[in-house]
Structures are given as C-alpha cells and as structure tokens.
Amino acid sequence: MNSLFDLTGKKAIVTGGTRGLGHGMAEGLMEAGAAVVIFGTSKKVIEVAAQFEAKGYWCKGIAVDLADDRARQEAFDQAVALLGGLDILVNAAGIQRRHPSPEFPLQDWKDVLNVNLTAPFDLCQMAAKEFLKKEQPCGKIVNIASMLSFFGGMTVPAYAASKGGVAQMTKALCNELASKGIQVNAIAPGYMDTDMNVALTDVSNPRYREITDR
C-alpha cells in the first residue's frame, strides 16, 4: 500500500455500504487499513460486513432507516462506540424516484430529499461534533454528490435537487470547518452501472440510447 493512501488505524463510517458505490468505497477504505462500520437499510448489511471480515478486514454492519431522525442518531452513536472513535464519514446512501416532473408525487419528493440531503447533513453535524471533541480537532467528511448536482437530468427532479443541495451543503460546511481541522469534500460521479441506474442501463430504454449516443 502506497503510504499516501495508508489509513491504518483510522476509523470510518460509510452509509449505503451494502451495494453500489458505497460498497466499493467501504472496501477501498478497508484495503487502505481503516476499520469501517457500514450502514444499510436491511439486515443484509450484517451479511455484507461478515463478507468483508472474511477477507480479513475489520467491518461491522448496522441496519438503519436513514429517514428516521432518532434511528440515525442511535446508529451513529453505536458505530462510534464500536469503532472507539471516528476519523472519517462517507455519506454514500441515496434513493431514487423517477416520474415525469408534472406528475412527480410530493411524497416521493419528500422521501428523496430526506434520505439524500437531510440525513447527510444530520450525519455531518454528528461527525463534526465528534471530531471537535478531539484534543487536536480533525476529521474528514466525504459526501457523494452527482453529475446531476450540475445537470438536471430527466424525470428525476427530486434526485437532482437533493444532489445539488449536497454540493452546496458541502461547500458551506467546508467554509466553516476547514479552519478547525475538518476537511469536507464531495465527489460527483457520472452515470454508474449500479442498482439505482438499472432503468438507464436497460438497452431497450430510449434514455439509454440518448446517453450512449452522445
């Protein structure tokens, strides 16, 4: 392992760690030496954590509904207790709803904004408070934004709004926390072949052709 990427002894929480980008990011942190607690919406997260541990990594899984304020706090506190502290938070969990904008259900809008924007902000606050408790405050927060933070996409107004919010929230937190030793950054991936994007990777979907023909 290149020493530039050595995270031996570091302690991390990764939301959305059972699949997709969150799963890959969690494994990347573990490959670099970090101990990781992954959050997932179902008991499958326990199985995934066990699979990581079978590879020789330190990993624990916590099932949590990130839309639930109290459950978020309880899961965070449990993770910090398991890890014995916290150095890194990766907000990778997200949900998607697809409807033409004129018919987009308001409840779907609320659900997406809650999981994709409110939950990450809440967890950022929790992590920042934990980092500031240290004798020498420090820590790293990585929020997963999207190319749709900058381009609106099609039939996904709630997702685009949530990821635009993540990008701006990240800038705001960075402005406040950088001087306190806390780094806050965002990654904005393009289209990825994950469960969230199965509607786009179906070759029979006209949207697939619109994207790949560019």
Locations of the language-model features?
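Conserved glycine-rich cofactor-binding loop
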Residues: 18-20
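Substrate-binding pocket helix/loop in short-chain dehydrogenase/reductase
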Residues: 100-101, 105-113, 208-211
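Alpha-helical segment proximal to the catalytic Tyr-Lys
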Residues: 129, 175-179
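Conserved glycine-rich Rossmann-like NAD(P)H-binding loop of the short-chain dehydrogenase/reductase
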Residues: 32-47
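Active-site loop-to-helix junction immediately N-terminal to the catalytic Tyr of the SDR YXXXK motif
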Residues: 104, 152-160, 172, 196, ...
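Active-site helix of classical SDR
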Residues: 124, 162, 170
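Residue(s) in the substrate-gating loop at a strand-loop-helix junction
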Residues: 146
